[in-house]
């Protein structure tokens, strides 16, 4: 989607890659006839900017799960405490409430640490400047109770850093929905 280039301060390359992806999505979606679901929020945010002009219907995984998938499932709330990390992109799209609602539908207790707002990965800079990630997540481990053994988010790079600095395994919110759901048979 161009995000790695954008995070490196290379806007022309980012825009070129985004246009390339948009053209591929137009083809894959039969010129916008089919919806596109993006499972990483930073790319969703970038691709949503031009969706109307291109005739695409782009959905972030959070809004797709909340609006289209959950109503079709029977959920069994897990007797667990989980951590949830709304990414910067999730917040910028105004989807943090839907993300929290998904998590609360699936787990008995959801922890969103107050002092952790950004994972500090900054696109892909966490690979080359790990101190950004370490600084942003310095309060994470202490903010999670011992009973909290897993975490969920909507960006794989954020999840890498969150896992590293929390001592818990973070992964996509899709996995949580999968763990607690069954198809609605009615």
Predicted features and spans:
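Iron-sulfur cluster-binding electron-transfer modules in prokaryotic oxidoreductases
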Residues: 1-186
């Amino acid at each position: 989607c161009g995000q790695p280039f954008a995070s490196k301060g290379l806007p022309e390359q980012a825009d070129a890659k985004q246009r390339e992806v948009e053209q591929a999505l137009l083809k894959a979606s039969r010129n916008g006839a089919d919806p596109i679901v993006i499972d990483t929020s930073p790319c969703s945010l970038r691709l949503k900017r031009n969706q109307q002009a291109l005739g695409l219907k782009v959905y972030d995984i959070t809004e797709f799960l909340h609006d289209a998938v959950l109503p079709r499932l029977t959920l069994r709330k897990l007797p667990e405490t989980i951590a949830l990390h709304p990414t910067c992109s999730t917040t910028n799209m105004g989807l943090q409430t839907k993300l929290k609602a998904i998590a609360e539908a699936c787990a008995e207790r959801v922890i969103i640490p107050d002092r952790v707002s950004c994972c500090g990965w900054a696109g892909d800079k966490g690979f080359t400047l790990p101190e950004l990630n370490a600084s942003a997540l310095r309060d994470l481990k202490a903010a999670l109770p011992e009973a909290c053994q897993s975490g969920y988010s909507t960006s794989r790079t954020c999840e890498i850093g969150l896992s590293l600095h929390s001592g818990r395994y973070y992964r996509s919110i899709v996995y949580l929905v999968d763990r607690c759901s069954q198809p609605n048979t009615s």
